């Protein structure tokens, strides 16, 4: 039986799953992910992104509700630098 050559396409589509042996060495198990695994992975990533967005917006809301003098100064300086970059073109 002839073994399939690893083409760049196959290498890029293979899922690398690293498992640790009892001896502490790492082995790589190559497998083609099925559509269920891909969808599961996609949903997990999107959930993490959504949680990150919620955290960022929550921190921004807290900042606006109770800003410190230093944070206000930083915010004003950032806006000023951004305004200077844009210039009078708007």
From Swiss-Prot:
Which spans does this entry mark as compositional bias, Polar residues? 1-16
Query: Which InterPro entries is this protein grouped with?
Result: Flu_proapoptotic_PB1-F2
Cellular component (GO) terms are: host cell cytosol; host cell mitochondrial inner membrane; host cell nucleus; membrane
Q: Which UniProt keywords apply?
A: Apoptosis, Host cytoplasm, Host membrane, Host mitochondrion, Host mitochondrion inner membrane, Host nucleus, Host-virus interaction, Inhibition of host innate immune response by virus, Inhibition of host MAVS by virus, Inhibition of host RLR pathway by virus, Membrane, Modulation of host cell apoptosis by virus, Viral immunoevasion
**Site entry (Low pathogenicity), positions:** 66
Entries under Pfam families matching the protein: PB1-F2
**Keyword Membrane, does the record have it?**
yes
Spell out the residue ranges making up region: Mitochondrial targeting sequence. Answer: 65-87
- What GO biological process terms are annotated to this protein in UniProt? symbiont-mediated perturbation of host apoptosis; symbiont-mediated suppression of host cytoplasmic pattern recognition receptor signaling pathway via inhibition of MAVS activity
Q: Where in the cell is it found?
A: Host mitochondrion inner membrane; Host nucleus; Host cytoplasm, Host cytosol
Miscellaneous remark of the record: Is not encoded in all strains, and seems to be dispensable for replication.
Protein role: Plays an important role in promoting lung pathology in both primary viral infection and secondary bacterial infection. Promotes alteration of mitochondrial morphology, dissipation of mitochondrial membrane potential, and cell death. Alternatively, inhibits the production of interferon in the infected cell at the level of host mitochondrial antiviral signaling MAVS. Its level of expression differs greatly depending on which cell type is infected, in a manner that is independent of the levels of expression of other viral proteins. Monocytic cells are more affected than epithelial cells.
UniProt family annotation: Belongs to the influenza viruses PB1-F2 family.
What HAMAP family does the database record attribute to this sequence? INFV_PB1F2
Q: What is this protein called?
A: Protein PB1-F2
Q: Which organism is it from?
A: Influenza A virus (strain A/Grey teal/Australia/2/1979 H4N4)
């Amino acid at each position: 039986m002839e073994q399939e050559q690893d083409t760049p396409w196959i290498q890029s589509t293979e899922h690398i799953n690293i498992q640790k042996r009892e001896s502490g060495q790492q082995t790589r198990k190559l497998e083609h992910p099925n559509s269920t695994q891909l969808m599961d992975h996609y949903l997990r990533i999107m959930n993490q992104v959504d949680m990150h967005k919620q955290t960022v917006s929550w921190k921004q809301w807290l900042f606006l509700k109770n800003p410190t003098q230093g944070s206000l100064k930083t915010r004003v300086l950032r806006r000023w630098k951004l305004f200077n970059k844009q210039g009078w073109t708007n």
